[in-house]
Amino acid sequence: MKVLCTVLVVTLLAGCRADVEPEPEVLEPAVWKSGQPWELALGRFWDYVRWVQTLSDQVQEELLSSQVTQELTVLMEDTMKAVKAYKSELEQELVPMAEDTKARLSKELQAAQARLGADMEEVRNRLAQYRNEMQAMLGQSADELRARLASHLRKLRKRMLRDAEDLQKRLAVYKDGASEGAERGVSAIRERLGSLVEQSRVRAALTGQPLQERAQAWGKQLRGRLEEVRGQAQDRLEEMREQMEEVRVKIEEQAEAFQTRLKGWFEPMVEDMRRQWADLIEKVQAAVGASTPVPSQKP
């Protein structure tokens, strides 16, 4: 039993020693001091966390209030806003890129951005937890809390550095894609300008011709157009003549047919009337003859 207790005590002492043993300092990239706005904002956050890690008397005093977490919140928001602004700026130049490639790059960049934001959020939450523990002091000494906080901050700074470098690389890929799209846009503009310059050169050459030559060219073009119109008019006139001749022939044929039908309709009627008239005359003559007395002979 004594041996077991001794082992437990040694283990606890070794763990405490491991907590307070200093780790190598994490060196931040120099580019965070002179890079993009988001890198400068992240550098300010990084410097603030490094100052908090010193756990000086001033840090201890501010950690017991909400000042440190408030300042970290402002630095976090500045960093993420700068990242979003830089990403939006690059997206404006990614228009010529294929949609699937652009979607993949955007998804990877958002994931890296979220990881960095989570790292900064965890730093702030850890400091808030330390403040609560210091105020409560639940069975722990201040030295133990400070040692544990220092260890956590070192680990968080390492992870934040790794995620920041990953975000930096993905933004570089994004920027390369934007540069490639911009180069394609410049090439298209260059080709368009070349075409416009060639058109301007042709116009300038035509403008530089003597007025007489230009007038002759216009006159020749006008004569050709007049000949074309005259030929079209003659063809149209001949076509109208043929159509009028066809109409005349049709009208004559219809008139002759109508005359034939009219004659066939009237002739039987006239013949019948003539026959009836002759019969009537014969009847009248017969009646008149019958009614006239025969003269008597005298002795």
From Swiss-Prot:
Task: Kindly list the places in or outside the cell where this protein is found, as annotated in its UniProt entry.
Answer: Secreted; Secreted, Extracellular space; Secreted, Extracellular space, Extracellular matrix; Extracellular vesicle
> The organism sits in which domain of life?
Eukaryota
Instruction: Write out the ranges of the repeats annotated as sequence.
Output: 74-95, 96-117, 118-139, 140-161, 162-183, 184-205, 224-245
Q: How is it modified after translation?
A: APOE exists as multiple glycosylated and sialylated glycoforms within cells and in plasma. The extent of glycosylation and sialylation are tissue and context specific.
Query: Region labeled Specificity for association with VLDL — which residues?
Result: 261-273
Functional summary from the UniProt entry: APOE is an apolipoprotein, a protein associating with lipid particles, that mainly functions in lipoprotein-mediated lipid transport between organs via the plasma and interstitial fluids. APOE is a core component of plasma lipoproteins and is involved in their production, conversion and clearance. Apolipoproteins are amphipathic molecules that interact both with lipids of the lipoprotein particle core and the aqueous environment of the plasma.
- By what name is this protein known? Apolipoprotein E
- Lineage of the native species? Eukaryota, Metazoa, Chordata, Craniata, Vertebrata
Q: Which gene encodes it?
A: APOE
